[in-house]
């Protein structure tokens, strides 16, 4: 739903990918590119959003130098006006970046799908929302296949999904054609209780790559001031089960996996 943290989630994932030495292209149609860059800066520099502008130059320089030793990944943020850019524009952008900057992204973030345009249909021209949003989803998936790169985007929920504590694929706003096209979908679920703990629930809705019943629901921590996601203690996952929000079969699988890889750090 609106305000749950779609952009924060995507900027946090983008920051994590950058730290792995990968190239990231972030296309925004909702927020100014400076605001997106600001969120990624806060995450990477480990500084609160409100403190970024007043960060002393020496401290900034130290953090930047330290960051440069950690990663060789490059970030490009590109802003388009809302509902005016489609896959044709994105293809031209990829070609231009490859030609002029020798930049090939390892992942593309698009913020967000519902406010893209379709390259095949004109909005409002005797085309209903189901067909229009499905067309955008198909075009973005085609872009991912053609360029062999993952495309990560977001959508909204319906009014019913906005107040629901257990979102399903049927709660996707505007078009069920979107989940029919996507390869992997998950929902971000928030509540007053989770917000008080600085946490958010993630629920797998669709997964063509693995069994979606494995770790169907799990909890992650949220630091909104630094636009950062982090792992929470195992107790939070157990509390999720005790509250009836998860399957016992999923939990046993999750606990078993956690035990096998308990010494690993991400």
Task: Please report, for each region that a protein language model flagged, where it lies by residue.
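P-loop (Walker A) phosphate-binding loop of NTP-binding proteins
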Residues: 1-2, 29
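C-terminal regions of RecA-like/P-loop NTPase motor modules
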Residues: 3, 88-105, 122-124, 139-147, ...
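Conserved lysine of the Walker
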Residues: 6
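Cytosolic-facing regulatory segments adjacent to core modules
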Residues: 16-104, 172, 217-218
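Flexible beta-alpha connector loops of hexameric P-loop NTPases
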Residues: 49-56, 78-84, 118-134, 161-170
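Structural recognition of the conserved hydrophobic beta-strand(s) that form the central parallel beta-sheet
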Residues: 109-110, 149-156
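Residues immediately C-terminal
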Residues: 115-118, 187
């Amino acid at each position: 739903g609106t305000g749950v943290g779609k952009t924060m989630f995507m900027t946090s994932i983008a920051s994590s990918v950058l730290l792995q030495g990968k190239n990231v292209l972030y296309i925004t149609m909702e927020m100014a590119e400076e605001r997106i860059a600001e969120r990624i800066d806060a995450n990477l520099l480990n500084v609160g959003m409100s403190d970024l502008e007043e960060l002393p130059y020496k401290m900034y320089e130290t953090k930047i130098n330290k960051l440069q030793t950690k990663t060789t990944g490059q970030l490009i943020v590109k802003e388009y006006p809302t509902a005016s850019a489609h896959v044709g524009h994105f293809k031209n952008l990829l070609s231009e970046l490859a030609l002029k900057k020798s930049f090939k992204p390892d992942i593309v973030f698009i913020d967000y799908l519902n406010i893209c345009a379709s390259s095949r249909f004109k909005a409002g021209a005797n085309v209903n929302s189901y067909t229009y949003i499905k067309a955008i989803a198909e075009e973005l998936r085609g872009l991912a296949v053609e360029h062999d790169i993952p495309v990560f985007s977001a959508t909204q929920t319906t009014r019913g999904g906005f107040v629901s504590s257990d979102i399903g694929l049927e709660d996707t706003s505007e078009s069920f054609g979107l989940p029919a096209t996507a390869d992997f979908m998950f929902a971000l679920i928030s509540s007053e209780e989770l917000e008080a703990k600085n946490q958010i629930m993630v629920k797998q809705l669709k997964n063509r790559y693995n069994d979606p019943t494995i770790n169907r629901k799990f909890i992650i921590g949220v630091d909104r001031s630094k636009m950062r996601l982090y792992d929470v203690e195992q107790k939070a996952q157990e509390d999720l089960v005790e509250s009836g929000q998860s399957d016992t079969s999923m939990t046993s699988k999750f606990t078993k996996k956690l035990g096998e890889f308990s010494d690993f750090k991400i």
